[in-house]
Amino acid sequence: MEESEYESVLCVKPEVHVYRIPPRATNRGYRASEWQLDQPSWSGRLRITAKGKVAYIKLEDRTSGELFAQAPVDQFPGTAVESVTDSSRYFVIRIEDGNGRRAFIGIGFGDRGDAFDFNVALQDHFKWVKQQCEFAKQAQNPDEGPKLDLGFKEGQTIKINIANMRKKEGAAGAPRTRPASAGGLSLLPPPPGGKMSTLIPPSGEQFSGGSLVQPVSGSGGATELWPQSKPAAAATADIWGDFTKSTGSPSSQSQPGTGWVQF
């Protein structure tokens, strides 16, 4: 193990109990009911640490922190840590001393939550170890790893809907030109129910209903506006024309001193 590897703490539980377990006579699993659960051999603190790929279950005194026993775990689940068959709060661990001696002891937690955290801490550590091994293999042989194929398979098609894009392009077209008004100003529409204002013509002439009106002096000095009648047609200008043709007179005007028309 390299000297540069540091030790990290994975889990700490303030109370754990240690039990002596009887030798297993058969290959069946351990049963916590066969232990003397009311008489634990030792009680203290449990701490799980990791250094490199190996996890360590350490049983320490809860006051002084003195190490009571230690169980190295290089694989989980495995022979280093086993669960009992009749409870989720008890486990069998394999402890080792510095001289190479090994022994199996039973540990138990008073709370099921502590037992769950103990189990999950070991699972997460060895899941991380497995990922590190896979990354190392891929780094050594990058060509052997799975390649991501983004190409189209034979006969495979893709459909793209660009209806929204066309709508956006039409909305973002050339802006509509506004009609220019005289003087750079535009006339506002009249308010609802109001009357349109009339344009003021030059002095001496006025418009009324679309026809030109000339001022006519009337009584009292007031100016009255009368529509200028259109001249009659030339064919009907002289109503006495048929009578004057017989006498050869070109005029239909009355003679001076008489009120009769000459026939």
From Swiss-Prot:
The modification Phosphoserine is found at residue 181. Residues 246-263 have a biased composition (Low complexity). It comes from the Eukaryota. Keywords: Cell membrane, Cytoplasmic vesicle, Endocytosis, Membrane, Phosphoprotein, Protein transport, Repeat, Transport. It is found in: Cytoplasmic vesicle, Clathrin-coated vesicle membrane; Cell membrane. Gene3D superfamilies: Pleckstrin-homology domain (PH domain)/Phosphotyrosine-binding domain (PTB). Expressed in brain, heart, kidney, liver and lung (at protein level). GO terms for cellular component: clathrin vesicle coat; clathrin-coated pit; plasma membrane. A motif (WXXF motif 2) lies at residues 238-241. A motif (WXXF motif 1) lies at residues 218-221. GO terms for biological process: endocytosis; protein transport; vesicle-mediated transport. The keyword Membrane applies. InterPro entries: NECAP_PHear (IPR012466), PH-like_dom_sf (IPR011993). Transmembrane segments: none annotated. Residues 167-191, 209-263 are annotated as: Disordered. Interacts with AP1G1 and AP2A1 components of the adapter protein complexes AP-1 and AP-2. Interacts with the GAE domain proteins GGA1, GGA2 and GGA3. The WXXF motifs mediate binding of accessory proteins to the ear-domain of AP-1, GGAs and AP-2 through hydrophobic interactions. Selective binding to the GAE domains of AP-1 or to the alpha-ear domain of AP-2 is tuned by the acidic context surrounding the motif and the properties of the second residue of the motif itself. Involved in endocytosis. Belongs to the NECAP family. This is Adaptin ear-binding coat-associated protein 2. It comes from Rattus norvegicus. The lineage of its organism: Eukaryota, Metazoa, Chordata, Craniata, Vertebrata.
